[in-house]
From Swiss-Prot:
Organism: Rhizobium meliloti (strain 1021) (Ensifer meliloti)
PROSITE patterns: COA_CT_NTER
Function: Component of the acetyl coenzyme A carboxylase (ACC) complex. Biotin carboxylase (BC) catalyzes the carboxylation of biotin on its carrier protein (BCCP) and then the CO(2) group is transferred by the transcarboxylase to acetyl-CoA to form malonyl-CoA.
Record key words, sorted: ATP-binding, Cytoplasm, Fatty acid biosynthesis, Fatty acid metabolism, Lipid biosynthesis, Lipid metabolism, Nucleotide-binding, Transferase
Name this polypeptide is given: Acetyl-coenzyme A carboxylase carboxyl transferase subunit beta
Keyword Lipid metabolism: yes
Family (UniProt): Belongs to the AccD/PCCB family.
Compartment annotation: Cytoplasm
Length: 304
């Protein structure tokens, strides 16, 4: 099939003067089956106009949409060891990295930057789900740690947009090490008296849920997002019983006190600004924190 698709069909189209039509010109709504032109979807922040279904949003587009005027300082991707375990399943891990980089034009799954949201300076971190399922590995962990350290240095809050299947299995224990590393960095931000807000997006699962995704001061969630540790099917097979309707969705978690609010994507910047304005105002008798002491950087899990 690949030989026909990659060689024969282009030759025939060339002879007949036909042009290849990109496969992603039209996007189908998973909920209603509605077909939406890709430009219309992008202009509507990757939300299906009729149904309101929230599609996965690219990390770069999310930060551009979040910050005032789409202007922000993008953080460089830290250099770490590539494929330290020389892992291979049905495909070499090094090949998966190369393919994901070509597909997303990113070095790894984390995109982070410093900018302003309605005049409030903050650091934002977003997962790119199209990069190996937004999984947390050495590079992603190091990028998150650096983002927390930058927020502390700038004395500003940090907003996290997780979208991940969990820890990156191709990096084994080195991937799992990022759970405590990112948690330590998160606690450094809290010790500095700075807010940490998490905006849970679809999906947020696995080790990411077991660490920084559920440790925010405030937890927002986009409508219909899948949020949990293990998948619904795995839980049902383990417990041998049917789970409640809507289990592991944003709305279910809001009803059961796991998230503070469900916010539509179009309303996120305004809602963040309103919440941060409240959190950043110091009470009249607030105890002054000493943040002058320089915080030592966390050790890198594996260096290049």
């Amino acid at each position: 099939m690949n030989w026909i698709t990659n060689y024969v069909r282009p030759k025939i189209n060339s002879m007949l003067g036909r042009r290849e039509v990109p496969e992603n010109l039209w996007i189908k709504c998973p909920e209603t089956g509605e077909m939406v032109f890709h430009r219309d979807l992008e202009e509507n922040k990757w939300v299906i106009p009729q149904s309101g279904f929230h599609m996965k949003m690219p990390a770069k587009a999310r930060l551009k949409d979040l910050f005032d005027g789409g202007i922000y300082e993008a953080f460089p991707q830290p250099k770490v060891a590539q494929d330290p375990l020389k892992f291979r399943d049905s495909k070499k891990y090094s090949d998966r990295l190369r393919d994901s980089r070509a597909k997303t034009e990113l070095e790894d799954t984390i995109v982070a930057g410093l900018g302003q949201v309605q005049g409030i300076k903050l650091v934002a971190v977003a997962h790119e789900f199209n990069f190996i399922g937004g999984s947390l590995g050495i590079a992603a962990g190091e990028a998150i740690v650096k983002a927390f350290e930058r927020a502390i240095a700038e004395k500003c809050p940090l907003v996290m947009f997780p979208a991940s299947g969990g820890a990156r299995m191709q990096e084994g224990i080195l991937s799992l090490m990022q759970l405590p590393r990112t948690t330590v960095a998160l606690n450094m931000l809290k010790e500095a008296g700075l807010p940490y807000i998490v905006v849970l997006t679809n999906p947020t699962t696995g080790g990411v849920t077991a660490s920084y995704a559920m440790l925010g001061d405030i937890h927002m969630a986009e409508p219909g997002a899948e949020i949990g540790f293990a998948g619904k099917r795995v839980i049902e097979q383990t417990l041998r019983e049917k789970l409640p309707e809507g289990f592991q969705t944003s709305e279910y978690l809001l009803e059961h006190g796991m998230v503070d609010m469900v916010v539509k994507r179009h309303d996120i910047p305004e809602t963040l600004a309103r919440v941060l304005n409240i959190l950043m105002k110091k009470p009249a008798k607030a105890v002054k924190r000493d943040t002058a002491t320089e915080l030592a950087p966390l050790p890198v899990a594996a260096s290049a």
